[in-house]
Structures are given as structure tokens and as C-alpha cells.
């Protein structure tokens, strides 16, 4: 059946309130869109990242009368009688199938492929990681993830111990293991990320070589030959002494989650522990690499 879509122009302060009210009114789906093509920088931990100008998009069943909902919204002091909104009917689709069709196998570097489970593997002789979009961040499509995957592919990880700091979906940890790492330790602040990393490691038959920890549970004496941290500039700076401590002398480091304009500052800061290389860039994002002094 077709659906009714209600789009409301608002701001980041009120978007969550509107979302909650629309769910109470019977919306079957709520999404947030960028109202003015403005990049999100660093949301605080635990917060939903929202743009200053946000569009709340609510989906309702086709037979829903939205008149009472619109009248209710008009009573909200931060919206008022003439709030900006649009109602339209959208065609019925197999939304799951359409979503799946958007994901294809992607190659990173010379050896590594990330493949959704429902797609045929393009090169069975390559290093193939089976990973579906789902829990936690990281499917290879974001530039920072791609930069890290390309870096891992460029290394000889045979018999190396690796730390994935901020492991998210586990994509980097699993890729490192498939590329020959002896052991990988994944660390993340989110239980959901730990679960997602474990599930993806099991799917790729490398779970026996992956250790996963919340930050407070990581071993005090943990060290690795290679450390990759795809997080954000703020945490990278705050955690720099700990990250440096985790890398063995002569070990390799990759940092991402950085915008281009943030890269030089972070590189300079890490240079007290590492010999830093020139930054690599993809779109508006950067990756820093270095060798432990």
C-alpha cells in the first residue's frame, strides 16, 4: 500500500520532541534529514547527531487522517499556526529490497574486499570480509573507514598484534585478522559495538583471535604492533597518551575520523610519541599514520 509522508522543518532543539509526539500519533517511522546541507562535526557521546536546521520526516499508513496531528502541532509554542511542513503520498515499494540494492562489494587496496552477505563475492581468491550494514558504525562506505581499510591492506600483518580502538562494527578488526594478523583487540565504549564486532568476527570465522573490551576492562599492560583508531578529533586528543602507551616501540599507528582542517593539529600533538607521515585525504576527511618512537 502507499504511504503518507509528513515533513516538518524545525531545529535541533525541537526535533526529538516532535519525533516523540509523532510516534504517539501513530507514525510508523521517523527519520531526520539535513535542512541546509550542513556537516555534522562531533556529537556528544550518547546523543543523536542533529543539524541546526533539521527536517523531521514521519511516515504514516495511507488511510491516516493527519488533520488532528497538524492541529496538535500548531499548539506547540515553538511551531505555531504557520509552521513549515509538507504532506505527500509516496509509492509503495519493497523498502528492504531497495535498501539492500544500494550495497555492493567494495575493494580496498589491492587485496581486500568488503562484501554484503547477499552479494556474490567478485574475487574468491581475494581477502574477503563478509559484512552487512546493521549494528554500530562502519560498513566501509564512509571515507574514514575506507582510509583505514586501505592502510591495513597496505601492511604486512603476518603474526602482528593489532588494536582497533573504537571498533564499532568490528570491520577494521575483522579485516586485520583476515589480512593475517595473529591477534586483534577491539575496544569500544558501546556494548552494542562489542556485540556487533563479535557477531561479525563469528560470521568471518575469526572470533577465536579477537578479544573485545569496554575501556574500563582493557588489560593495563595491553600493547600491539599496530593500532588503528577511527574515532573523532576530540577523543583522539584526549586519549593520545593512552593510545601512545598501547603501541610497541617501532609499531605502526593510524588515526582517522578527522576532518581535513583538524589533521595538522592532531598530527603535531601525536608527534611527541610518533614520527608522523603526511596526511592522506578522502573527500573532506583525513587519515594520519606514524611510527612509534
UniProtKB/Swiss-Prot annotation:
It catalyses: L-lysyl-[protein] + 3 S-adenosyl-L-methionine = N(6),N(6),N(6)-trimethyl-L-lysyl-[protein] + 3 S-adenosyl-L-homocysteine + 3 H(+). It is found in: Cytoplasm. It comes from the Bacteria. One of its GO terms (molecular function) is protein-lysine N-methyltransferase activity. InterPro entries: Ribosomal_L11_MeTrfase_PrmA (IPR050078), Ribosomal_PrmA_MeTrfase (IPR004498), SAM-dependent_MTases_sf (IPR029063). Its EC number is 2.1.1.-. One of its GO terms (cellular component) is cytosol. SUPFAM superfamilies: S-adenosyl-L-methionine-dependent methyltransferases. This is Ribosomal protein L11 methyltransferase. It comes from Shewanella sp. (strain W3-18-1). The gene is prmA.
Amino acid at each position: 500500500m502507499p504511504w503518507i509522508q509528513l515533513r516538518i522543518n524545525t531545529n535541533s532543539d525541537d526535533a526529538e520532541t516532535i519525533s516523540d509526539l509523532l510516534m504517539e500519533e501513530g507514525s510508523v517511522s521517523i527519520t531526520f534529514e539535513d535542512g541546509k546541507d550542513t556537516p555534522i562535526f562531533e556529537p556528544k557521546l550518547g546523543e543523536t547527531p542533529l543539524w541546526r536546521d533539521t527536517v523531521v520526516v514521519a511516515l504514516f499508513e495511507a488511510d491516516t487522517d493527519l488533520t488532528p496531528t497538524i492541529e496538535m502541532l500548531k499548539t506547540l509554542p515553538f511551531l505555531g499556526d504557520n509552521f513549515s511542513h509538507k504532506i505527500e503520498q509516496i509509492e509503495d515499494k519493497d523498502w528492504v529490497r531497495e535498501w539492500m540494492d544500494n550495497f555492493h562489494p567494495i575493494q580496498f587496496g589491492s587485496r581486500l574486499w568488503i562484501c554484503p552477505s547477499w552479494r556474490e563475492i567478485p574475487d574468491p581468491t581475494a581477502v574477503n570480509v563478509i559484512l552487512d550494514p546493521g549494528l554500530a558504525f562502519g560498513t566501509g562506505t564512509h571515507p574514514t573507514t575506507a582510509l583505514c581499510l586501505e592502510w591495513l591492506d597496505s601492511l604486512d600483518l603476518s603474526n602482528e598484534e593489532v588494536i582497533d580502538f573504537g571498533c564499532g562494527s568490528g570491520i577494521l578488526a575483522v579485516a586485520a585478522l583476515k589480512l593475517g594478523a595473529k591477534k586483534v583487540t577491539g575496544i569500544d565504549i558501546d556494548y552494542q559495538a562489542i556485540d556487533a564486532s563479535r557477531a561479525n568476527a563469528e560470521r568471518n570465522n575469526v572470533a577465536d583471535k579477537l578479544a573485545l573490551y569496554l575501556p574500563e576492562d582493557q588489560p593495563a599492560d595491553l600493547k600491539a604492533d599496530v593500532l588503528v583508531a577511527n574515532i573523532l578529533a576530540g577523543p583522539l586528543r584526549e586519549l593520545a597518551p593512552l593510545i601512545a602507551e598501547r603501541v610497541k616501540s617501532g609499531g605502526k599507528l593510524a588515526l582517522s575520523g578527522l576532518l581535513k582542517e583538524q589533521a595538522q593539529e592532531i598530527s603535531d600533538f601525536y608527534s611527541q610519541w610518533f614520527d608522523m607521515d603526511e596526511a592522506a585525504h578522502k573527500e573532506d576527511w583525513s587519515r594520519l599514520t606514524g611510527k612509534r618512537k
